[in-house]
Amino acid sequence: MAAKLLLLLCLFSGLHARSRRVEEDENEDSPSNQKWVLAPKSQDTDVTLILNKLLREYDKKLRPDIGIKPTVIDVDIYVNSIGPVSSINMEYQIDIFFAQTWTDSRLRFNSTMKILTLNSNMVGLIWIPDTIFRNSKTAEAHWITTPNQLLRIWNDGKILYTLRLTINAECQLQLHNFPMDAHACPLTFSSYGYPKEEMIYRWRKNSVEAADQKSWRLYQFDFMGLRNTTEIVTTSAGDYVVMTIYFELSRRMGYFTIQTYIPCILTVVLSWVSFWIKKDATPARTTLGITTVLTMTTLSTIARKSLPRVSYVTAMDLFVTVCFLFVFAALMEYATLNYYSSCRKPTIRKKKTSLLHPDSTRWIPDRISLQAPSNYSLLDMRPPPPVMITLNNSMYWQEFEDTCVYECLDGKDCQSFFCCYEECKSGSWRRGRIHIDVSELDSYSRVFFPTSFLLFNLVYWVGYLYL
């Protein structure tokens, strides 16, 4: 009996041990318990040993070759995009990859690996240049999904450090030719604390490259190209090497042509309609003139909204102002015509040299005769003809129209340049003078206004676009 119990116990122990071995084998085959090897353990250990050795006695507060020679920084810039450009704030936005390369002899190492590619965690452990963008208003480094920084160390001590930046940089726009202006917007950088005796920047060959312009947000500008320069700037703290990239931009005129130039031209042309309206239609001509003046005022206000409050006159300001003057002059033309064509009571003009006061002892005219064409009838619907007044063998012309007589200006008033009616054209004052018939002012304006406006446009567009 005891022998049977011992046999059963041995069988149970064997089965239990076998089941445990099967479970262990299954656990070893499961993916969660497998160990993935990304690199040989010896190489991983080699990189760690190299970094530990390089940083063991490294002082990141000191620049390379301090006290021996200046540190040379080679610069590369890759432009992702430019824009938008703000004329009001005098700034533009740019997205770049900024790369700096220099040599640090303290980071030389001997290994089968030529390059150590590291992430942003190593940036704070070594010395990097204190580069600043001198004309930046705001700047932002990209951190999604990780800090957009790259660090590479060569075995000869050369270091490459790149990062992605979005910068709002200042651009002093000269708007004298606006909106036909072109600008060179700079991006300027230098060392913050190291003068040229300690740090020198220089451009690498083909150091500035640009991405495809389809994604750029230059809504009102065309990108014409870029150029880079190097200069020495003297300050109270020393002489600094300053690097500058100029982005050449030319403004597109399409938006301003539609929004400002065409409406202004059409408003000026509309004001000329007044010259073909009868001069006695005072409400119509006055309403048209005031409406066009107010329209030009509104267009002028809208045109200035896209500009900063500069103290000088821009090309658009000049055009809008001249258009306003043309519209205002058209309104004043009718005011002048209406004033000098006013209807007055019938009077007989007397010659100053012929008539005296009744109390005077000199002679008084004793014969006045009125003559009119014999074929004119009171029932005639035509305008009344001119009537000749004979006063002591001196003739005067009066224009009768609807019982109104248009009184000629006195001789002393006519002696300047303007002549109202036929009788004003007689006399010694007309010798060598210009004679303008005010009653024909509309006829003159129909030619003068379009011609002068056409000449102005010719000079304006040729001067700003080609000179």
UniProtKB/Swiss-Prot annotation:
PTM section of the record: May be palmitoylated.
Pfam families: Neur_chan_LBD, Neur_chan_memb
MF (Gene Ontology): GABA-A receptor activity; GABA-gated chloride ion channel activity; transmitter-gated monoatomic ion channel activity involved in regulation of postsynaptic membrane potential
Protein's UniProt keywords contain Membrane: yes
TM segment ranges: 257-277, 284-303, 312-332, 447-467
Main location (coarse class): membrane
Expressing tissues: Expressed in brain.
Catalyzed reactions: chloride(in) = chloride(out)
Gene3D superfamilies: Neurotransmitter-gated ion-channel ligand-binding domain, Neurotransmitter-gated ion-channel transmembrane domain
Location of the protein in the cell: Postsynaptic cell membrane; Cell membrane
Topology Extracellular: residue spans: 18-256, 304-311
GO cellular component, as recorded: chloride channel complex; GABA-ergic synapse; microtubule cytoskeleton; nucleolus; postsynaptic membrane; synaptic membrane
GO biological process, one term: response to xenobiotic stimulus
NCBIfam families: LIC
Subunit details: Heteropentamer, formed by a combination of alpha (GABRA1-6), beta (GABRB1-3), gamma (GABRG1-3), delta (GABRD), epsilon (GABRE), rho (GABRR1-3), pi (GABRP) and theta (GABRQ) chains, each subunit exhibiting distinct physiological and pharmacological properties.
UniProt comment concerning the protein's domains: GABAARs subunits share a common topological structure: a peptide sequence made up of a long extracellular N-terminal, four transmembrane domains, intracellular or cytoplasmic domain located between the third and the fourth transmembrane domains.
Name the record gives this protein: Gamma-aminobutyric acid receptor subunit gamma-3
Organism of this sequence: Mus musculus
Gene name as annotated: Gabrg3
